[in-house]
């Protein structure tokens, strides 16, 4: 076991504060900065695995700029020390490789930054924190996550779950990377024992789920977390990607993509004015749900030209499998049918078992039907079932424990089958992937701040999923407390925002609405300067109002435009109730 020499580290500290990047970015300096084995419980460092090299001509796109507009889109040269370290878990014989990027000493602002990944991939880029003067890291999670996605390694073989990879992907790898990274950062820059290292997390989609896993399980490590559209409630969320296909097979109708698009666009047009301004954005999907009947669209004409489209094949979209795919759609000309509207209504209504008990929530009205898009069969000249691989692969690998990339058929699959799959996965992965622990006392008590947001028209992860978790936290942490007091106390450390018209972790091509672009600036101001947000700063990037700044309403207040330039944040109890769900199809609480 290595011995940690305080005198040597103190000397390194003084040198690091005054030295250039070239002076501190050496293998010996990094090895001296490693915590001694036994200091971090369950982590034994491998000093011989350390690498270090100074990087001067690399640019950073900045934080999570490519995932939902967070962190900006700057492309600036940030010199940094590119470090690789490795560790093992005592008794396991494994090896976890972690990359860290340390800004040159003159740029360091006593910050550590963690970026989330997406789909079944953890982030492999360690440079996201550079623009904030933050050290940052990325981990291979012990299963070479730099080269393989988690779904590729979840099974050793049929019937045999790789639990080590599962727990590492679920939360452990990022928690260990941050625990080690904060200690290493402190020593690398020679900070005094009482010096603060502000630690931030930022991510969307599964990156949002990963962030929630850190807040739930490593709350005292983080000062601020920004989580967008979290893919938590994993069992329900992933199986829900098969729900739209089961609706179509149950109703025996596969709407042409153009018919589905017409239903969405006509709904947007009809509900746009309900929020008080006609701008192409439905800021109040709750009012749309309460006051608009999709049946009014029956008989409306639609037309779409023939097209060939390509999917990149990543993330939690319809096509999860790696590798791009190409599909052909013929020209489509027709009118919206009652069968098409029936499919749309059933999807928006959400999954119920055959006893009529609700099992899960669904996408907000005006969301695209991403999981419902059928395939064109040239041989039969008809639209046919296309099972989304995001949901299908989860069922085969995570529920059935078969090493298959998708379901081959939905024969004999009913709504009850979906509920059974959800229940099986919920029980199996409750302490790993589910990520729904509602007691955030540790995070709150440590002074942590949570900024949680979700695109209201997200077609992948329902916006109501985030609303449900927010309400779960409120009810668990403030039992017996009045509504006004619990809300006031909660908003001091946990704020949730719905983004009008927004899609999954980004702006929506169908609705030219606002989107947040400087969440990290807001979070840093909140954490380091005590400036608590009241509303969320967003910018409209397209359409007639491009460039407009909108300060969004904090949940549970809802926007209502007074005129074309000003909106109020109002309390609308009936609308808020439309976002509330219980799930009696399950016999245990679903947070």
Range-by-range predicted roles:
Residues 167-170, 254-258, 329-332, 456-457, ...:
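Active-site rim elements
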Residues 231, 244, 248, 273, ...:
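Short, well-ordered loop/turn and helix-capping segments at boundaries between secondary-structure elements
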Residues 276-284, 301, 306:
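Acidic, glycine-anchored loop motifs typical of Ca2+
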